[in-house]
Design a protein with these regions (language model features):
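Activation/maturation switch segments at domain boundaries
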Residues: 1-119, 199, 212-324
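Structured, charged N-terminal subsegments at the starts of enzyme catalytic cores
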Residues: 82-197
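Short, basic interhelical loop/turn and adjoining N-cap
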Residues: 199-206
Length: 324
């Protein structure tokens, strides 16, 4: 079934997000430990003085890493703009350098998450159009610019990329606060392990919610495009909720309800109705069949027309049942 296959696709991307976030958090903790160790082993130097001394080698390594990230052509313009901030920064002391190193790690982690979400949403649009073509027997040729427009449409006041980078800003501020505690108060990074683990779970949850919810939105946008192109302005669609113990009240309420395609709006009368929404839509069968037979009326003898109607009806039913 289409809903189940899309759920599996979502799960695969969530696993990739979990890996990226785990590596990002591990790098953050590793850098905190490394800086704490350097301060703890500074011989003959007062703690307050040690934290001010910037190792030229550390700066050089950081600049090389920042430059390498900026030159990554896979990242978006927004990601590269964020990364360039670290490539041109000045470093007055160890605390500032540490904050920039951690900020670079966080930014790179979110750039990689953005890539995963972007590719998943584009693939979701393509799969949805292919699925609709299997049901209705008609392809819609969509330009890459149309796919991109669907993927980056606003849902509410912001699009998914803007929401993702807002989440990055929040995590970066939290990490910088931890860095200040390590550098200014000499607190061991181990004290922050519970908080770091909490941030890891929260980061995964935020991106997962964004990915699944936006996947439902682009499915709806792609379905609407296909319905209008193949069935016309008077076409209708049926809201289909995934029925189980997790199904929300609002999706249960809308399940099996029929609406005009021209009035189709995600979050209003089409998925997603809420975060993590798993509902979808299908063309309204009764409406489609009526049009299907009306277009062919009078083209055949009465006897043959009856045979044709039965054959066509059986063919459509099989296609809908099999999800082709």
């Amino acid at each position: 079934m289409f809903i189940q296959s899309e759920t599996l696709e979502d799960a695969a991307k969530v696993a990739e997000i979990e890996r990226i976030v785990a590596m990002m958090i591990a790098d953050i903790y590793k850098n905190l430990l490394a800086y704490y160790a350097k301060l703890a082993t500074a011989k003959g130097i007062d703690w307050r003085e040690a934290k001010k001394i910037v190792d030229a080698f550390d700066v050089e390594m950081f600049q090389m890493q920042a430059k390498a990230y900026v030159e990554n052509k896979d990242f978006s313009d927004k990601a590269n703009k964020e990364l360039k901030r670290y490539n041109t920064a000045m470093y007055a002391n160890r605390e500032k350098l540490l904050k920039h190193e951690l900020g670079l790690i966080v930014t790179k982690g979110y750039a990689e998450q953005e890539n995963v979400v972007n590719h998943h949403l584009q693939e979701t649009v393509t799969r949805t159009l292919r699925h609709q073509a299997g049901i209705l027997g008609a392809d819609v040729h969509v330009k890459p610019t149309d796919v991109e427009a669907i993927v980056y449409s606003n849902f509410g006041k912001l699009n998914w990329s803007e929401r993702l980078w807002n989440n990055q800003d929040e995590l970066r501020k939290d990490v910088e606060r931890m860095a200040s505690h390590v550098m200014l108060r000499g607190r061991h990074p181990y004290e922050f392990v519970p908080e770091i683990r909490k941030k890891q779970k929260q980061t995964v949850a935020n991106t997962k919610r964004l990915l699944i919810t936006e996947a439902a939105r682009v499915q709806t946008e792609a379905q609407k495009l296909h319905y209008l192109e193949t069935m016309g302005d008077d076409a209708e669609y049926e809201f289909v909720a995934k029925r189980d113990e997790k199904t929300s009240k609002i999706c249960r309420h809308y399940d099996k309800k029929v609406f005009k395609v021209k009035d189709m709006v995600p979050g209003v009368n089409a998925p997603p109705m809420h975060p993590h929404c798993r509902s979808t839509t299908v063309p309204h069968v009764g409406n489609w069949r009526d049009k299907f037979f009306k277009d062919r009326q009078g083209k055949y003898s009465v006897e043959y027309d009856k045979v044709l109607q039965k054959s066509a009806k059986d063919e459509m039913t099989d296609a809908l049942d099999s999800g082709r």
